[in-house]
Amino acid sequence: MKRRNADCSKLRRPLKRNRITEGIYGSTFLYLKFLVVWALVLLADFVLEFRFEYLWPFWLFIRSVYDSFRYQGLAFSVFFVCVAFTSNIICLLFIPIQWLFFAASTYVWVQYVWHTERGVCLPTVSLWILFVYIEAAIRFKDLKNFHVDLCRPFAAHCIGYPVVTLGFGFKSYVSYKMRLRKQKEVQKENEFYMQLLQQALPPEQQMLQKQEKEAEEAAKGLPDMDSSILIHHNGGIPANKKLSTTLPEIEYREKGKEKDKDAKKHNLGINNNNILQPVDSKIQEIEYMENHINSKRLNNDLVGSTENLLKEDSCTASSKNYKNASGVVNSSPRSHSATNGSIPSSSSKNEKKQKCTSKSPSTHKDLMENCIPNNQLSKPDALVRLEQDIKKLKADLQASRQVEQELRSQISSLSSTERGIRSEMGQLRQENELLQNKLHNAVQMKQKDKHNISQLEKKLKAEQEARSFVEKQLMEEKKRKKLEEATAARAVAFAAASRGECTETLRNRIRELEAEGKKLTMDMKVKEDQIRELELKVQELRKYKENEKDTEVLMSALSAMQDKTQHLENSLSAETRIKLDLFSALGDAKRQLEIAQGQILQKDQEIKELKQKIAEVMAVMPSITYSAATSPLSPVSPHYSSKFVETSPSGLDPNASVYQPLKK
């Protein structure tokens, strides 16, 4: 088998690209695409009256059922469908409609943004806040425009299906932890048995093994890889551990043996199929550091060519097979495949080491000639790129700190505004109480004013009636006066003609009548002034009444409430009266029952006494009846009669020859 040496100096390097502009344009285009898709789906929802975003979890469910049927069999797929259907039914029955639609839509859009390569950052969080705000403020209250009965099962599936997948994920996580624990226990047992086997060897071989181990550790400078490397699933690395690979490995040699294990735990992106034992300690140290820095920048063609060369010659290029954790990209969180490779054991490592050390020194020289110029060419670029990465990390850290400070300032401002709103709420409550008190006082004043208005209207009517009556009397008085004057003139003329003596009396009478007329005119003027004043008061009261129409509405509402309360009080009093009557009737019935029971007991006692007396009478009475010989006037009495019943003890004479009952 021919050996091929990779000419590292002739490898094609990729063109340099400005990563800052590329990242900005790529991220903005990605989030603009998200916004456009979201807007189009909302528009389709509004136009067609159906929520199309609910179909995406249904499509994911169909894919997962197909994958489970293809890889895990029919039984598991049927079980998965039954569990998902049960979860959907529970969500459909027990979650209210509005909360169900809100949770389903929010989960769909949040999960859609989560499926990006960016992870959790400020744009994704802002998109999440936008989606949640739109769902809560607009679509949460507006369910009339959609077919609720058609969309509700899909909404229940959007909640039930993630719950089922979360349950399966939790189960797999628990089983993974249990498997790791079992592996650790088995590893401890294997180490214990290995120590027993080493102790069982002769002491000379034990000393030789110890010396070999010390020489290997001193020559390598880097500790050997643990045989218990964690097997990584899904072929990816978590997003929060992509940047923690370069710095711990650069400082690899400065730390002790205990810290080396912690640094290896952070290097989670190493593929298990490519872990091999190094050929030489110096060559391994140089090429490990070089390839760790350069593998971050190599494109896919370079990686493919180096992997083909590594497969053909595993000894010369064993140290080039380390892959950087930052170069591995996680495909999607839904991937179910695993990259579980075989890790070589300690015996295979020793065999490879012996094979590689047995080669001629010319191979080492060739390898140094092929790789050292490449190291000298690539180290400055790697350092520059590392410095750029460090600057980017510092800038990101500073930006995150600024965002954190802004969020804290927003939280403090929101808390202060909340306190101000609470104080304003207290003031508004106090103002509301004051306004209620003023309204109550205004209602009371309005009642008083209405009472005064009614009294004044009554007085006005009385004054108008008195005025009309006085005017009638005045007209009658004028007519009578005219008639009297006419009659007086006639009488004067007649008297003057007949007698000249009556003129003085008539003149006195005329004077008196004129004085009375003047008095009546004065009284009329006074009454007219009073009537004018009353009319002015009535006008003022009418204006006041027109201004208080709003208070009349309040009074009507208050009167209606008072009528209701009066009706309720009347009904309550009627119910209490009925209850009292029922209780009194119940007491009377109980008393009558007790009296009847007492009478029944008395009758029972009387019956018992009568039975005793009957028994005594029947015991003493002869077999034949006798007539009353001594008293012929008395009628024949029967053998037994109720008239002979006595409450006192029996007064019979036992010495009598013939028994005769005594009549009382």
UniProtKB/Swiss-Prot annotation:
TM ranges? 28-48, 75-95, 120-140, 154-174
GO BP annotation list: neuronal signal transduction
For bias type Basic and acidic residues, the affected ranges are 253-265
Glycosylation positions in this chain: 324, 340, 452, 655
- Membrane topology recorded in Swiss-Prot or TrEMBL: Multi-pass membrane protein
Q: Name one GO cellular component term.
A: rough endoplasmic reticulum membrane
PANTHER family from the UniProt entry = MACOILIN (PTHR47464:SF2)
Indicate what this protein is called per its UniProt record: Macoilin
